[in-house]
């Protein structure tokens, strides 16, 4: 993708976050971001003006909603079991200055279970559980090129805390 200098742009936004613990083992997290970023003065050529267009690669809205439930057994070899689920969303995004190509809002649903045994944590996880189609990047040159986001995936991780 080619980045060009624009005459003048403006970006304003706000981000809010909330953490709640309605009962001891349950933690809920919510965050929301709003960004309004546009070109105030961008004359590409004598006949083409991008003044007033939205800045490329800047989503208008971002959203994250996560919940985790922690179980701490009183006996046994497991120190902690954490079950978590999260939804991450990205609002409409324009891929270049002309604002002709965009991606609408999408959300990814992820989940994870992790068990901790002393210095070792074993995780089972799933990402993009709804198999949402989305692009992580797009640009147009002599042809259009895009990078698709990852499809639904499952995996496991083994973490050693040394």
Model-identified regions with their sequence ranges:
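Flexible, surface-exposed loop regions and adjacent strand-edge segments
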Residues: 1-2, 41-53, 99-104, 138-147
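Gram-negative outer-membrane beta-barrel transporters
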Residues: 4-96, 157-161
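Short, basic/aromatic-rich helical patch in the C-terminal catalytic core of site-specific tyrosine
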Residues: 16, 111-113
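Surface-exposed coil/turn segments at beta-strand junctions on protein surfaces, enriched
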Residues: 21-23, 58, 104, 115, ...
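Transmembrane beta-barrel architecture of outer membranes
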Residues: 60-64, 106-110, 149-155
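C-terminal beta-signal and adjacent terminal beta-strands/loops
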Residues: 88-96, 114-162
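Outer-membrane beta-barrel transmembrane domain signature
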Residues: 90, 102-107
């Amino acid at each position: 993708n080619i980045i060009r200098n624009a005459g003048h742009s403006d970006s304003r936004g706000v981000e809010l976050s909330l953490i709640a613990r309605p009962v001891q083992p349950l933690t809920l997290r919510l965050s929301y971001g709003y960004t309004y970023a546009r070109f105030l003065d961008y004359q590409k050529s004598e006949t083409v003006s991008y003044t007033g267009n939205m800045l490329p690669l800047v989503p208008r809205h971002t959203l994250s909603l996560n919940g985790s439930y922690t179980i701490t057994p009183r006996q046994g070899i497991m120190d902690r079991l954490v079950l978590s689920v999260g939804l991450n969303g990205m609002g409409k995004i324009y891929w270049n200055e002309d604002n002709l190509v965009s991606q609408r809002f999408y959300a990814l649903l992820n989940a994870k279970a992790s068990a901790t045994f002393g210095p070792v944590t074993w995780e089972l996880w799933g990402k993009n559980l709804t198999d949402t189609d989305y692009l992580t990047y797009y640009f147009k040159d002599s042809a259009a090129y895009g990078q698709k986001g990852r499809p639904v995936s499952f995996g496991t991780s083994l973490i050693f805390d040394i």
